[in-house]
């Protein structure tokens, strides 16, 4: 990954990616039974290889998925695993200015920014684009406020948006609503590679296996399913 490049006054393109030529990672291959997992897992699965790291090495945590009584674990890549494997320090971004201004500042420092946004303004969001309002997470890697253009990872790929979508995504200061949750990614080191990465990943697998659920999560879900179905059947599905 090259260092951040200024493409114009007040704009940053961190990775120099092209939406037309970006190819999703193999974990997001179209022939998979479940192409997408959840917004946070998916965005990291694309961001990691863009930063030069194999996401497969960070998957040991998945053995800890459990049935939590009312849902299956909404799992995420553990931040401590990303640090240990890839030298990535993920920190919460304290928002006091506009999200646009913070994104520009952090990208200028070489830090990708993960932002909770309204998928209403994401052209790649399919049926919810300009219709529904659903919270999701994107990873910002390029921004040009003057051109009102934004480059980001979301779900299974790299995308760009501009114009009215940019305006909607980055609401002006003082607009109603709360600040979104944001994180930025600092690269503390080059990360592990080759045999060292394999060894560290296997070590994490042993760690997570020791903490895996004591009972079968699918069996626990099966036992709770009749009660859940009864509640759902009594609700207005609209």
Q: Where are the model-predicted features located?
A:
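Predominantly the structural core of cysteine protease catalytic domains
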Residues: 76-117, 191-199
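Cysteine-nucleophile protease catalytic domains, especially the papain-like/related folds used
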Residues: 2-97
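Short alpha-helical interface elements
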Residues: 68, 72-73, 107-108, 128-132, ...
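Noncatalytic regulatory segments and standalone regulatory/sensor domains
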Residues: 145-238
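Charged/polar, solvent-exposed surface patches and flexible loops
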Residues: 46-49, 81-85, 101-105, 168, ...
């Amino acid at each position: 990954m090259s260092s951040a490049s200024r493409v114009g006054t007040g704009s940053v393109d961190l990775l120099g990616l092209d939406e037309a030529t970006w190819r999703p990672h193999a974990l997001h291959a179209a022939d998979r039974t479940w192409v997408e997992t959840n917004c946070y897992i998916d965005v990291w699965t694309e961001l990691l290889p863009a930063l030069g790291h194999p996401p497969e090495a960070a998957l040991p945590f998945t053995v800890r998925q459990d049935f939590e009584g009312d849902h299956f674990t909404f799992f995420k890549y553990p931040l401590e695993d990303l640090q240990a494997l890839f030298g990535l320090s993920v920190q919460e971004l304290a928002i006091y200015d506009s999200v646009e201004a913070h994104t520009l500042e952090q990208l200028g420092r070489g830090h990708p920014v993960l932002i909770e946004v309204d998928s209403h303004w994401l052209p790649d969001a399919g049926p919810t684009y300009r219709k529904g309002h659903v919270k999701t997470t994107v990873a910002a890697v390029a921004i040009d406020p003057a051109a009102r253009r934004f480059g980001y990872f979301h779900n299974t790929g790299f995308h760009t948006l501009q114009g009215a979508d940019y305006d909607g995504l980055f609401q002006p200061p003082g607009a109603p609503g709360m600040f979104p949750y944001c994180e930025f990614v600092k690269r503390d080191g080059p990360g592990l590679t080759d045999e060292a990465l394999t060894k560290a990943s296997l070590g994490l697998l042993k760690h997570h296996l020791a903490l895996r659920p004591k009972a079968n999560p699918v069996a626990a879900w099966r036992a709770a399913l009749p009660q859940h179905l009864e509640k759902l059947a009594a609700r207005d599905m609209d």
